[in-house]
Amino acid sequence: HNDLRQLMVSTDPPYYDNIGYADLSDFFYIWLRRSLKNIYPENFSTMLVPKKEELVATPHRFDGSKQAAKEFFEQGMSKVCGQIHQYAIGNIPLTIYYAFRQNDMDEDGMASSGWETMLTAIITAGFSITGTWPMRTEKPGRSVSIGTNALASSIVLVCRKREAADATCTRKTFLRELKSELESSLAHLQASNIAPVDMAQSAIGPGISVYSRYAAVLESNGSPMT
């Protein structure tokens, strides 16, 4: 869009090493390059798809280090959210499609580091998450879901610039606000005909909506709550 003051961003970001997009693209790239390199020499200047800056956590690009790959992905995700925040305006929300998976929840129903990483990047950039909705984005009969009680394929995160960019609150204040809003929010979700299997992940929404109003929620000793 030529006018960045009216820029709308809706994105389905990469998820650690789940899909190697650039590697998959090589299959098509070599054939396209053969046909089009003389027409678009700048776009087809390399033998294969460039991969150095691809935002995925693939250890083989970091001498086999899973930790280095993880840090590259998380730092890159934070940088992306920060850049989006520079252009975001109040009346147009940012929407992010997060592919919430069965293994994103542990045995106690707690979210995994993948979920935490995404939320941290969004909040640190200065966004507040004002809405979360589960969305079925895969065919019900796909092979990985047959015979399972599969979660909704994605959660749509609706984000807006936080009104007070550096505001903080205490853990006590956060819990008080959460308690006052959670019951009505859950009732609204139940009235929306959300499938029971999706309710646990949907219930995360009201909580992170309150949490993301602040740049940090502080413990009694002044340290950030995680």
Predicted regions and their residues:
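S-adenosyl-L-methionine-dependent nucleic acid methyltransferase catalytic domains
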Residues: 1-226
